[in-house]
Amino acid sequence: MSLIDPRAIIDPSAVLADGVEVGPWSIIGAGVEIGEGTVIGPHVILKGPTRIGKHNRIYQFSSVGEDTPDLKYKGEETRLVIGDHNVIREGVTIHRGTVQDRSETTLGDHNLIMAYAHIGHDSVIGNHCILVNNTALAGHVHVDDWAILSGFTLVHQYCHIGAHSFSGMGTAIGKDVPAFVTVFGNPAEARSMNFEGMRRRGFSEDAIHALRRAYKTVYRQGLTVEQALAELAEPSAQFPEVAMFRDSIQSSTRGITR
């Protein structure tokens, strides 16, 4: 049974599963689907087409599924898809996609989106990511699993943030960030790898040492990207983690943060 505050406004076409809670003065628009156990706090606005999975919690004053401000957007039907077990804190804004890209903005599972963060149109957020307060993603940004973007991080459109990477507070990212890499500054510069995060997630010391050597190959030996990738071919065959690091560099379309 859902628990809906009588002061909430819910469009008749919205679909709410069992166990959904909706707080006072929240507005749930047409085309919104909410999975079981999800809690919508007070003063939240949800606009469709938006599908929200199970056991999420969305806090007050968040705007989720609003039209994109992209000037090319002319009212086409686009969507937002949110997975399960996400926490979306106060004042977060998440926009739907555009037909010029995927027509969809996607947020995976088990993410923490902290207060006043923004996720722009057509962005793709993986699983177990953390966007700290006031982080802002422009349109078309991809953030891979377990990435952490510290407070006030700004990410340029079309950037790709690799898995297990980390940005320091106030970092301005204009190029792709390879997997595992730690970046700081405005403009962002690569400083090291997220070794502490790796240890917390149970990476073996052998894998961490291999990644340390791989980082030095790319960032400390004065090699071109092509030369560094060639040097990483052998350790990539031995360590999947190094292969992930190498692949994130090889697939970069904007160039990597150096």
Curated annotation (Swiss-Prot):
GO molecular-function terms, A-Z: acyl-[acyl-carrier-protein]-UDP-N-acetylglucosamine O-acyltransferase activity
Highest taxon above the source species: Bacteria
One Gene Ontology cellular component: cytoplasm
InterPro entries hit by this protein: Acetyltransf_C, Acetyltransf_C_sf, Hexapep, Hexapep_transf_CS, Lipid_A_LpxA, Trimer_LpxA-like_sf
Pathway(s) where this gene product acts: Glycolipid biosynthesis; lipid IV(A) biosynthesis; lipid IV(A) from (3R)-3-hydroxytetradecanoyl-[acyl-carrier-protein] and UDP-N-acetyl-alpha-D-glucosamine: step 1/6
Keyword Lipid metabolism tagged: yes
EC number: 2.3.1.129
Presence of the UniProt keyword Acyltransferase in the record: yes
Alphabetical UniProt keywords: Acyltransferase, Cytoplasm, Lipid A biosynthesis, Lipid biosynthesis, Lipid metabolism, Repeat, Transferase
GO BP field: lipid A biosynthetic process
Function: Involved in the biosynthesis of lipid A, a phosphorylated glycolipid that anchors the lipopolysaccharide to the outer membrane of the cell.
Record PANTHER family: ACYL-[ACYL-CARRIER-PROTEIN]--UDP-N-ACETYLGLUCOSAMINE O-ACYLTRANSFERASE, ACYL-[ACYL-CARRIER-PROTEIN]--UDP-N-ACETYLGLUCOSAMINE O-ACYLTRANSFERASE, MITOCHONDRIAL-RELATED
Subunit details: Homotrimer.
Similarity field: Belongs to the transferase hexapeptide repeat family. LpxA subfamily.
Protein name: Acyl-[acyl-carrier-protein]--UDP-N-acetylglucosamine O-acyltransferase
Organism: Pseudomonas fluorescens (strain Pf0-1)
Gene that this polypeptide is encoded by: lpxA
